[in-house]
Structure formats: structure tokens, C-alpha cells
């Protein structure tokens, strides 16, 4: 029900399932919705009982868009949501949907029928998507550094973004053994590096390291893009 429905005001606490930025276009709507609710009901505790976006570890884009099911859009979505929640510290609870991909018989999306791919980890529990490491950067005290989009090896651009997640305050990036830059910040670090031929990048944060390889190609790798077909679940993204 909506925020004005009397049912929404029976309990002491309330949470909504909201997928603004996934089923509904516009990530910024999350901020507007929360601000509006808090303006109208300043004493009413608000939570998010579900939020998420689907992401496939085999689908990739350097310009991710809502509905493309790429690992990159899922990460972009969760980056926004975590910053959004941090801006609204009066919220009482948030519940990411979901930790793992799960069976959903009526769905036919992302190139794998019968599954919901909103998990931070694949259904078999073997592959941690980039979004998993984003939450680790925000929530975990275990020191780590993670280079994103490792599976997005083939790139057509002459300059690429190397995104790094870490819970350390400083991250240095090396390209083919040469230091390309160092940044201080929180959670998300972004570097621009030239891409000619094949490169190996290494991220260093304290005593933590991570490596990845990328190569320049003339034409996009077709396996990175989802080919959508009409299905019984076409009403979903």
C-alpha cells in the first residue's frame, strides 16, 4: 500500500519494497521518496524491506543502463543506494534483495530462465558479483581490495575506467608494473587508464592486493550483451 493508506500507520515501524532505479527508471527517485515521506511523517520510522537490481556475471557494459542485466549496472545501482541510505541516517532498517540468486519459475530474464538474478552471489554460491564486494567495503572490518569488472576483459575503448572497492582509506593502482595513480577516499575508487593492447592492473591497499587483465579489441564481444526476446515475464525489466 502507499504511504497515505491508513494500513501503513497501524504498526510502530514500517518498511516498503521499493525498486526505484530498477523496475521504475530513475535512481534519484529514492532520495525524493524518502525525503517526501520524512517531510510528511517526520516522526514515523521508515525502512526499505526490499531493494535490488538484477546482474549477470557474464553480461557487461562500460555504459551500463537499467534493464541491461549487466554486472556493472547492478553495482552502479547498489553504489547509489548505499550512498542514499547514508544520506538518510534516520532510517530504521534496510534489507538488500538478495544475498543469492534464487529460483523463480515464472521468470525468463538475463538469459537464464527460471531464476531471479538480484543476488550478490550466484545461485550455486560460487561466484561473488562485484556488488558483493561493494557491501564488504561498506560493512566489513576485514581488510581487502577488489578490482571490479574482472570478467569484462575485452574492451573497445582507448581509455577505460578501473573501479576498485576497498574498506581501506587509500588505494594505489599499477598498470603493467608502473604506478598509474593513488587515491584516498571511502569504499569506491575510480581510475582512468589508457588501454592499448593487453594490460595488467594491480590494486594495492595497505597489505592487500588484487589483479586483473584487460585487452583492447576492435569490435565488441557479443557475449557480453543480453539478447532480449519476448517472454511470459516481459512485464518485468
List each model region and its residues.
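Extended substrate-binding grooves/exosites of carbohydrate-active enzymes
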Residues: 1-180, 184, 190-210, 218-224, ...
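Compositionally biased low-complexity segments at domain edges in trafficked proteins
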Residues: 227-237
Amino acid at each position: 500500500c502507499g504511504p497515505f493508506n491508513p494500513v501503513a500507520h497501524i504498526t510502530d515501524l514500517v518498511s516498503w519494497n521499493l525498486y526505484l532505479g530498477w523496475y521504475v527508471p530513475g535512481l534519484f527517485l529514492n532520495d525524493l521518496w524518502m525525503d517526501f515521506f520524512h517531510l510528511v511523517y517526520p516522526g514515523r520510522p521508515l525502512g526499505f524491506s526490499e531493494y535490488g537490481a538484477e546482474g549477470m556475471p557474464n553480461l557487461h557494459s562500460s555504459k551500463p543502463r537499467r534493464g541491461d542485466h549487466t554486472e556493472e549496472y547492478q553495482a552502479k545501482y547498489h553504489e547509489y543506494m548505499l550512498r542514499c541510505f547514508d544520506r538518510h541516517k534516520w532510517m530504521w532498517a534496510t534489507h538488500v534483495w538478495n544475498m543469492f540468486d534464487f529460483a523463480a519459475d515464472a521468470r525468463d530474464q538475463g538469459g537464464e530462465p527460471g531464476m531471479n538474478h538480484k543476488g550478490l552471489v550466484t545461485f550455486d554460491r560460487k561466484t561473488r558479483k562485484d556488488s558483493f564486494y561493494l557491501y564488504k567495503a561498506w560493512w566489513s572490518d576485514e581488510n581487502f581490495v577488489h578490482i571490479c569488472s574482472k570478467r569484462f576483459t575485452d574492451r573497445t575503448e582507448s581509455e577505460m575506467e578501473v573501479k576498485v572497492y576497498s574498506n581501506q582509506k587509500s588505494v594505489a593502482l599499477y598498470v603493467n608494473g608502473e604506478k598509474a595513480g593513488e587515491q584516498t577516499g571511502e569504499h569506491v575508487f575510480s581510475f582512468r587508464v589508457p588501454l592499448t593492447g593487453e594490460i595488467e592492473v594491480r590494486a594495492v591497499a595497505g597489505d592487500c592486493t588484487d589483479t586483473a587483465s584487460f585487452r583492447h579489441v576492435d569490435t565488441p564481444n557479443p557475449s557480453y550483451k543480453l539478447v532480449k526476446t519476448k517472454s511470459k515475464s516481459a512485464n518485468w525489466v
